């Protein structure tokens, strides 16, 4: 193991002050969710947020889906090397999918990194940091399989009103462009009772909205032999008192069945929103991607959803420039996008990911061709997004106010949140009106539309119609009591046989106890975007 003695001097003792941390997140909602668990684990071990100041510990939670993820990581690590030289006792940790994939390469390229951990052992981070600090030596720990389910780790949620709930981890699909199954393993499903208990715990903690997470949520139940388990789970979650909004991501078109559409339509708490990855509109390219569906099936799913859930906002993922993609293939993608009328799309230029079947395919598309096609696709989708948003102008929508969505709210006297269909809404607070708290719900009339958001300006200066919620109450309590930290749960006894723990999470528990709690063995912590 490489030494980091030349990069790390002894850190200040924790009796002087708690050490501070910052978690930087790249990638999907799974990673956002994982970062909440990393944050919770650090706070359970006595670390405190740097709150924008220069941190003693910087944790980078990485993504491996695109080539620029590597460039972004090593660019950030290069910058942090200079910071670390002047910041006594600073530590740097790299985790997530890219760490799982590259392993020792991270330390070879950036020997000033203190800890490298993977997707299967997030709960070990506090222990690895303490070990690296004590030994003056970098710690590399990558596990090949999941030991503790992520949802059982302590958590610190960014949004009190909303929470992520993992229903499964891993993926059984074999898409030729995707590295995720190799890094996160085969699908493992949680039991429905554990999921519902976690949702109830989140609601008890103030949440009014949850997003169910999985690499392929509608294959949920495959491990325990119930192919309609996901639809049943939606209905059961919808029966939890106090839970107002349910979302989920991401389904797979090949396994998306009508019982799920029925559950969406018949469960009031399930929001009129669907993220359905297309990837390509060309049947030939879909076959090369091993996507197991074709464009007409995909469009048929959207038609059935819109029949049962009118005005559903449907979003998607699209890859441009997959190996072998011709202009004719790309035109098929444009055709399907025009027909699908997505409210928005996450669009990507294909990049080679070593370790995937697509990386060795012939007919890699030249970068300049990919870039030109990408520009045409994004222009088309931006026009469609604007047109779809304009259809909402004049309607009254309920907005769940967010604490973090708006970036200019202080300058514009607006607050920001999400409508029930997931659209971002900036709403004006008229002079003299009460201001909604994060977590409160506000009924507003949409007055303007842009491609990526809606605006609700006051037309008559009347006070906002605010519905105060339990989530707003919880936010207010959190503002008054900012010393709460997650409490770690206990794991199996030493020497027990390895297994995957599928238990429940530990949520925020306000306490007046010292935040310099001893660091325990990471394997003893039960565990909880992507």
Curated annotation (Swiss-Prot):
Residues 19-134 form the MTTase N-terminal domain. InterPro entries: Elp3/MiaA/NifB-like_rSAM, Methylthiotransferase, Methylthiotransferase_CS, Methylthiotransferase_N, Methylthiotransferase_N_sf, MiaB_methiolase, rSAM, rSAM_horseshoe. It is found in: Cytoplasm. It catalyses: N(6)-dimethylallyladenosine(37) in tRNA + (sulfur carrier)-SH + AH2 + 2 S-adenosyl-L-methionine = 2-methylsulfanyl-N(6)-dimethylallyladenosine(37) in tRNA + (sulfur carrier)-H + 5'-deoxyadenosine + L-methionine + A + S-adenosyl-L-homocysteine + 2 H(+). Keywords: 4Fe-4S, Cytoplasm, Iron, Iron-sulfur, Metal-binding, S-adenosyl-L-methionine, Transferase, tRNA processing. It holds the Pfam family Radical_SAM. Residues 509-530 are annotated as: Disordered. GO terms for molecular function: 4 iron, 4 sulfur cluster binding; metal ion binding; N6-isopentenyladenosine methylthiotransferase activity. Belongs to the methylthiotransferase family. MiaB subfamily. This is tRNA-2-methylthio-N(6)-dimethylallyladenosine synthase. It comes from Clavibacter sepedonicus. The lineage of its organism: Bacteria, Bacillati, Actinomycetota, Actinomycetes, Micrococcales.
